[in-house]
């Protein structure tokens, strides 16, 4: 399968959101810091945090799922830079303590976790979700639990059939030859907001930002690694989320 056609630097006016409220993300009214998790976005939710339009759409989607016996529960939503950095440091310390080299530890981390400042969860448009109406134990964000006899298989099937109606799209698909983060059947993004935000994010000097941050292991972020991370981890996603 051919590689995803990566987004071009288009203006916000090129983003078509005809099926949704005209509340598309307006970067002129938003601090650039919000794109990298260092701002203070206005968020809504009880036990989770999303931007208003994404929150309203989620509430409608959750209500529709309830009618089918599915109780959508948000495991993760908005995460600021500090939160993402805690995740990064915890994993980096654990993997290097287990004997992995710094480079191998970083490679293992970015199978599922983002480098602080690059997470879609910084935007308050993305959610990790499960079904609370089932019996489960242990780690919940595991692909096999969303397939076959897994406790969240019914949720996955319902989302595949209905989530797009509410503006939510899976981010990291199981598409053949897709690179970057591994398949995450639990991670959905509210496209009417996240698409234009990604367009604006692309305009930032991501390479310069990553090289300037003093993260654990960041001395190994050479130009080749950063270019690959941007191309594969940030941009090789569901084409429906690309402008």
Regions from the PLM with identified roles:
Residues 1-243:
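Extracytoplasmic cell-surface/polysaccharide-interacting catalytic and binding patches
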């Amino acid at each position: 399968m051919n590689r995803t056609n990566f987004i071009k630097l288009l203006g916000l006016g090129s983003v078509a959101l005809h099926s949704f409220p005209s509340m598309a993300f307006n970067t002129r009214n938003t601090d650039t810091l919000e794109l990298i998790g260092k701002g203070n976005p206005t968020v809504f939710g009880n036990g989770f945090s999303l931007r208003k339009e994404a929150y309203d759409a989620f509430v409608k989607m959750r209500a529709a799922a309830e009618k089918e016996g599915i109780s959508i529960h948000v495991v993760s939503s908005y995460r600021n830079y500090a939160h993402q950095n805690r995740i990064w440091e915890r994993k980096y310390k654990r993997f290097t303590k287990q004997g992995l080299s710094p480079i191998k530890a970083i490679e293992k981390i970015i199978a599922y976790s983002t480098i602080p400042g690059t997470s879609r969860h910084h935007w308050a448009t993305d959610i990790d979700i499960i079904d609370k109406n089932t019996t489960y134990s242990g780690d919940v964000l595991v692909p096999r639990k969303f397939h076959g006899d897994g406790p969240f298989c019914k949720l996955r099937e319902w989302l595949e059939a209905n989530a797009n109606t509410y503006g939510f799209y899976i981010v990291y698909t199981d598409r053949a030859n897709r690179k970057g983060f591994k398949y995450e059947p639990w991670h959905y993004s509210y496209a009417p907001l996240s698409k234009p935000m990604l367009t604006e994010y692309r305009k930032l000097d991501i390479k310069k930002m990553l090289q300037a941050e003093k993260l654990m292991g960041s001395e190994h972020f050479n130009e080749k690694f950063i270019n690959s991370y941007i191309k594969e981890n940030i941009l090789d996603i569901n084409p429906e989320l690309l402008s």
